[in-house]
């Protein structure tokens, strides 16, 4: 297996773990105000289990929903919840460029998470698409600003993640074009989730090497 194939496999594996931070982390955060120790224990246990068995959290939630006979569009629900900041991904360096990176990523994720509310109103959805395009450009501009100002030993990892983000941005654009032909919103939701995931990975990569 080549290095690129290994990275792609790792990305795909972590994608199924979106449920952990999009669905369960907010639950743990709420629990902290009631029982801090229990919340920390549960968070650590879920993180460990998810790391060893990627997708486990999603499987558990799907089984619970199935047992309770709750019918929801999980892909859509995940997208609605995926805009929140995730501490593990947020860059904690104080320099303006890094804080800008956090803010640009947050802005893009928030716009993407609104797609389910906008998609059935053509005028509003077209404006949302324009906002997403602007947010993507602003995020990439900020990434380039960081590249210019700071030198990294592990620049290849950063360049790779930037290319992955651009690739998924183009894929999202292609999905939108197809949607206007076939009307299948679920494909737009899934593509938006992947783009949010890539946005988080950009933050994670910078946080790791910064």
Curated annotation (Swiss-Prot):
Family as reported in the entry's similarity comment: Belongs to the PDCD10 family.
Pfam family, one: PDCD10_N
Gene3D superfamilies, alphabetized: 1.10.12.70, Nucleotidyltransferases domain 2
GO molecular function term, any single one: protein kinase binding
Residue stretches spanning the membrane: none
Gene Ontology biological-process annotations: angiogenesis; apoptotic process; blood vessel development; blood vessel morphogenesis; chordate embryonic development; Golgi reassembly; heart development; heart morphogenesis
UniProt keywords, alphabetically: Angiogenesis, Apoptosis, Cell membrane, Cytoplasm, Golgi apparatus, Membrane
InterPro entries per record: PDC10_dimerisation_sf, PDCD10, PDCD10_N
Origin superkingdom: Eukaryota
Subunit field text: Interacts (via C-terminus) with CCM2. Interacts (via N-terminus) with STK25 and STK26.
UniProt membrane topology term: Peripheral membrane protein
Species this protein is from: Danio rerio (Zebrafish)
Protein name: Programmed cell death protein 10-A
UniProt lineage: Eukaryota, Metazoa, Chordata, Craniata, Vertebrata
């Amino acid at each position: 297996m080549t290095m690129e194939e290994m990275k792609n496999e790792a990305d795909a594996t972590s994608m199924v773990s979106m449920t952990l931070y999009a669905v369960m982390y907010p639950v743990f955060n709420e629990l902290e105000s009631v029982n801090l120790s229990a919340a920390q224990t549960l968070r650590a246990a879920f993180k460990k289990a998810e790391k060893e068995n990627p997708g486990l959290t999603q499987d558990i939630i799907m089984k619970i929903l199935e047992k309770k006979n709750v019918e929801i569009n999980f892909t859509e629900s995940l997208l609605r919840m995926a805009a929140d900041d995730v501490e593990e991904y947020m860059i904690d360096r104080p320099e303006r460029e890094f804080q800008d990176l956090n803010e640009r990523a947050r802005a893009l994720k928030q716009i993407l998470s609104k797609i389910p509310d906008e998609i059935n109103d053509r005028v509003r959805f077209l404006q949302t698409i324009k906002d997403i395009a602007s947010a993507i450009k602003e995020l990439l501009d900020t990434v380039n600003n960081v590249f210019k100002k700071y030198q990294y030993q592990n620049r290849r990892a950063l360049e790779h993640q930037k290319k992955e983000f651009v690739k998924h941005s183009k894929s999202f654009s292609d999905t939108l074009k197809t949607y206007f032909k076939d009307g299948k919103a679920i494909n737009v939701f899934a593509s938006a989730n992947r783009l949010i995931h890539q946005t988080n990975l950009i933050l994670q990569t910078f946080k790791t090497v910064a």
